[in-house]
Every structure is written in C-alpha cells, then in structure tokens.
C-alpha cells in the first residue's frame, strides 16, 4: 500500500528541499529565486560540495502551507537547467 505525501503531512509545516546541481555560483541564487516565487521569506540555504567538487547540494527549508506548493516547487526546482536532482 502506497502512502501519499499529503497523507503524511499536516499543513502548515516546515519542509526541506535538497537540490543537487552543477557547482556554479548561480545555483544558490536560482534555487532561492524559485522558492521566493512560491514561499516568500528570508532564506539562508546551506551548501555542500561533492567530494570531487563538480556538484553542490543546496538545502533550503520553507514553511509549506499546502501540498500543491510542495509539488510545484519540486517541479520548478527540477526545471532549473543546472539542477540534476531534487529530493
């Protein structure tokens, strides 16, 4: 039996995205720009480089107000050209 994400969450709730992308200076700015469109706020994302330094992982936590917001952000963050994966 599959459990859907919206069945596990009670809104509003803190929700963290981990965005993996190319190690370019604009990665963090592009992630924050997309998040600001759907969940305006003051964000201080954390950034971790990969072991070889080719990729960066950007973690950012929002205060999610509904499941559609969570799903839209997954989609739009994944559409950033230099992003490889969103968890």
Curated annotation (Swiss-Prot):
InterPro entries: UPF0250_YbeD-like (IPR007454), YbeD-like_sf (IPR027471). It comes from the Bacteria. Disulfide bonds: none annotated. GO terms for cellular component: cytosol. Pfam families: DUF493. Belongs to the UPF0250 family. This is UPF0250 protein KPN78578_06520.
């Amino acid at each position: 039996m599959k459990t859907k994400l919206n069945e596990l969450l009670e809104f509003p709730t803190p929700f963290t995205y981990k965005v993996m992308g190319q190690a370019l200076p604009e990665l963090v700015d592009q992630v924050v720009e997309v998040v600001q469109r759907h969940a305006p706020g003051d964000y201080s994302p954390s950034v971790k480089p990969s072991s070889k330094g080719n990729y960066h992982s950007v973690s950012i936590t929002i205060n999610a107000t509904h499941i559609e917001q969570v799903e839209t952000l997954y989609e739009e963050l994944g559409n950033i050209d230099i992003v490889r994966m969103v968890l």
